[in-house]
Amino acid sequence: MTNQEISLIFSDIAAMLRVKKDNIFKIRAYEKVARSIAELKEPVEKLVAEGRLKEIPGAGEAIRKKLTELAASGRLAFYEKLKAEFPEKQSSSPVSGAL
Protein backbone atom coordinates (compact mmCIF):
# COMPACT_ATOMS: atom_id res chain seq x y z
CA MET A 1 0.00 0.00 0.00
CA THR A 2 1.41 3.40 -0.93
CA ASN A 3 1.86 6.30 1.44
CA GLN A 4 -0.74 8.21 -0.57
CA GLU A 5 -3.31 5.44 -0.05
CA ILE A 6 -2.52 5.29 3.67
CA SER A 7 -2.78 9.07 3.91
CA LEU A 8 -6.22 8.98 2.28
CA ILE A 9 -7.39 6.36 4.76
CA PHE A 10 -6.37 8.55 7.69
CA SER A 11 -7.98 11.58 6.04
CA ASP A 12 -11.18 9.55 5.67
CA ILE A 13 -11.03 8.58 9.33
CA ALA A 14 -10.67 12.25 10.32
CA ALA A 15 -13.60 13.24 8.10
CA MET A 16 -15.88 10.55 9.50
CA LEU A 17 -14.91 11.39 13.08
CA ARG A 18 -15.68 15.05 12.32
CA VAL A 19 -19.17 14.12 11.09
CA LYS A 20 -19.67 12.08 14.27
CA LYS A 21 -18.59 15.14 16.28
CA ASP A 22 -15.83 13.15 17.95
CA ASN A 23 -13.07 14.70 20.05
CA ILE A 24 -11.51 17.57 18.06
CA PHE A 25 -8.00 16.68 19.25
CA LYS A 26 -8.43 13.13 17.95
CA ILE A 27 -9.68 14.49 14.61
CA ARG A 28 -6.72 16.84 14.35
CA ALA A 29 -4.31 14.02 15.16
CA TYR A 30 -5.65 11.97 12.23
CA GLU A 31 -5.51 15.01 9.94
CA LYS A 32 -1.93 15.77 10.97
CA VAL A 33 -0.71 12.21 10.51
CA ALA A 34 -2.44 12.02 7.11
CA ARG A 35 -0.47 15.09 5.98
CA SER A 36 2.75 13.75 7.49
CA ILE A 37 2.39 10.40 5.73
CA ALA A 38 1.66 12.09 2.39
CA GLU A 39 4.93 14.02 2.73
CA LEU A 40 7.12 11.07 3.75
CA LYS A 41 10.04 10.18 1.50
CA GLU A 42 10.13 6.57 2.71
CA PRO A 43 7.28 4.06 2.55
CA VAL A 44 5.33 3.64 5.79
CA GLU A 45 5.74 -0.12 5.45
CA LYS A 46 9.53 0.32 5.60
CA LEU A 47 9.24 2.47 8.73
CA VAL A 48 7.03 -0.20 10.32
CA ALA A 49 9.51 -2.96 9.45
CA GLU A 50 12.39 -0.93 10.90
CA GLY A 51 10.51 0.13 14.04
CA ARG A 52 10.76 3.80 13.08
CA LEU A 53 7.10 4.93 13.28
CA LYS A 54 7.96 7.46 15.99
CA GLU A 55 9.67 9.46 13.23
CA ILE A 56 6.29 10.28 11.68
CA PRO A 57 5.11 13.66 13.00
CA GLY A 58 1.78 13.31 14.78
CA ALA A 59 1.90 9.52 15.05
CA GLY A 60 1.07 8.80 18.68
CA GLU A 61 0.85 5.32 20.13
CA ALA A 62 -2.73 4.61 18.97
CA ILE A 63 -2.00 5.75 15.42
CA ARG A 64 1.29 3.81 15.32
CA LYS A 65 -0.66 0.65 16.24
CA LYS A 66 -3.09 1.35 13.40
CA LEU A 67 -0.23 1.89 10.96
CA THR A 68 1.32 -1.41 12.05
CA GLU A 69 -2.00 -3.23 11.56
CA LEU A 70 -2.45 -1.65 8.13
CA ALA A 71 1.09 -2.52 7.02
CA ALA A 72 0.81 -6.10 8.29
CA SER A 73 -2.61 -6.97 6.91
CA GLY A 74 -3.57 -4.31 4.38
CA ARG A 75 -6.69 -3.75 6.48
CA LEU A 76 -7.65 -1.53 9.37
CA ALA A 77 -10.51 -2.76 11.59
CA PHE A 78 -11.15 0.72 13.04
CA TYR A 79 -11.53 2.18 9.53
CA GLU A 80 -13.82 -0.62 8.40
CA LYS A 81 -16.01 -0.16 11.48
CA LEU A 82 -16.28 3.58 10.85
CA LYS A 83 -17.08 3.06 7.16
CA ALA A 84 -19.92 0.73 8.14
CA GLU A 85 -21.56 3.64 9.97
CA PHE A 86 -21.62 5.82 6.84
CA PRO A 87 -22.95 5.49 3.30
CA GLU A 88 -20.23 4.45 0.81
CA LYS A 89 -20.31 7.88 -0.83
CA GLN A 90 -18.86 9.46 2.35
CA SER A 91 -15.46 7.93 1.69
CA SER A 92 -12.99 9.83 -0.48
CA SER A 93 -10.36 7.11 -0.42
CA PRO A 94 -9.83 5.28 -3.72
CA VAL A 95 -8.90 2.18 -1.73
CA SER A 96 -11.94 2.31 0.54
CA GLY A 97 -13.70 -0.47 -1.32
CA ALA A 98 -10.55 -2.58 -1.29
CA LEU A 99 -10.24 -2.63 2.48
Model segments located where?
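Long, highly charged, low-complexity intrinsically disordered interaction regions
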Residues: 1-99
